[in-house]
Amino acid sequence: MSVTLTFDAARRKTYRESGYWGDASLGDYWRQTARAVPDKIAVVDNHGASWTYAALDCAASRLANWLLSQGIQPGDRVAFQLPGWCEFTLIYLACLKTGAVSVPLLPAWREAELVWVLNKCQAKIFFAPTVFKQNRPVDLILPLQNQLRHLTHIVGVDKLAPATTALALSQIIDRSEPLQSDINIHGDELAAVLFTSGTEGMPKGVMLTHNNILASERAYCARLNLTWQDVFLMPAPLGHATGFLHGVTAPFLIGARSVLLDIFTPEACLTLLAQQRCTCMSGATPFIYDLLCAVEQQPA
């Protein structure tokens, strides 16, 4: 089910004339980058996964084809509750290829938040890890299906353990053919719904168009003089704006590398920084503080 968006006509005209907004979608930018640098590493994570732009594009195309086969249409919401894994980017790209709206969720959310958010955004498909932090997130949602009015499928992201009670992401990718042609989406259409953390009430969904995200991340890269040679480290949750926009989206807009970390510790962060020769990192103040403290404690 698509969402009708209303724009301030004068502001939209100004943004388009200024070059902030255009007709292109995030998917258009992804395809351009994947064609330009197919063999370049697009994303890695701390579990050793590494995908080139070409390989990631192929896997996302297979998942996109499956989404369409399950009745997903442009504007439908697809939710995924994943930590900093390469699979997060893969699912996001599959949504871009089909015109589905990405709804990334925080891994820390439990039953109450999940039921609220999934019903609020009317998500049709939900992805969650089979195992993460000694929990089984995908099994958490299965008993709640009768409370989720719009949900049709639950997919287990079987990165750390096999999927025993749900569809498995790896099997979907293995058994699906690549999508023959991505669905064309206009820049003014809805791209993602990011939910607030809900510290003062239930989480609230913030609707972002392709143009919203593109204007933000092009400005971010330009202001920091980031290029295709940069390597972005993202220790923040990908369900937050910082992780979703700066850690996953911005890198592929410019053909850079995204380095993801699922559980932040200063030691793990410093290890990835050195291993991947990262040049850029974004995070909240506590992340930076802990990182600097760890550096100070290292032997000279």
Each model region followed by its residue ranges:
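ANL superfamily adenylate-forming
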Residues: 7-9, 132-187, 294-297
